[in-house]
Amino acid sequence: MPEKYINFTPPLSLRSGHLQSLLGSSGLRRRAVLKRAVALQEAAEVWTLDGGDGIRLQGYYSKHAEGGRGLVVLLHGWEGNVNSNYMLGTGARLYGAGFDVFRLNFRDHGDTHHLNPGLFHSCRLGEVVHALSDLQDRLGASRWGLAGYSLGGNFSLRVGLKAGEAGLDIGRIVAICPVIDPAKAMDSMESGLKFYEWYFERKWSRSLRAKAICFPELYGQETWHEIRGLRARTHYLATKHGYAGAEEYFDGYSIARGRLENLSV
């Protein structure tokens, strides 16, 4: 990596992490990203992957006509999707550098609510591993790269733990700001600026309503989107999926307390 990147320090006016988060989702940023991602998006094909047990996950595959330098799979964060600014920006940079890029949507992210009856939750690791195995087999990929942001970073590292037994030939994993301890992340969100909890609560409500529209026979009478507070809503939905409550659910996808010790990628 060039030294100018290793030693980079943002201008004083842009050092606030909160400001960087806001600017990252701004309209100005969006226009710049879309301009850079034209080639990536023009090359993109919609692929539906086998997640096992009838589960389907969808993503976008951008391949170089003359053969690329290798495959990189990108995983987005919670309530993001394959067209989030950071996914397009990273994908465009990788594609421009000669890599084939696959951007995977998690269940119920993007416009995929109709693909599976069950709701997304962060402990659904098996379907992501199965889908990536399907992708690897279909492409004949070897020593491919996996990168994820936030919750996607958490998934990437957990996929790495399963890589050996699943036969995934992952050469490198990059996790950007991964969720390490979900319980502590929730504590921080509740004690920090209320904007973040409001932002995710609003996006999650929209997603849950979309799910109910796709499967009215299953969720038409549910009022989960009306439960205020991320912890309360998480607790309610966790109990619907076999967990004692939010804390047990958080522990189910935590990678804290030595759980990455056996990561060999």
How would you name each of these model-derived features?
Residues 1-33:
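N-terminal presequences and immediately downstream first alpha-helices
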Residues 26-67:
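N-terminal cap/lid segment of alpha/beta-hydrolase-fold proteins
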Residues 56, 62-115, 134:
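Short, surface-exposed "cap/lid" segments of acyl-processing enzymes
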Residues 88, 92, 129, 157-161:
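Short, hydrophobic alpha-helix immediately C-terminal to the catalytic nucleophile
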Residues 93, 107-145:
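Catalytic nucleophile-loop/oxyanion-hole region of alpha/beta-hydrolase
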Residues 141, 145-241:
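Alpha/beta-hydrolase-fold enzymes
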Residues 238-259:
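Active-site nucleophile elbow and catalytic-triad environment of alpha/beta-hydrolase enzymes
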Residues 264-265:
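Catalytic His-Asp charge-relay segment
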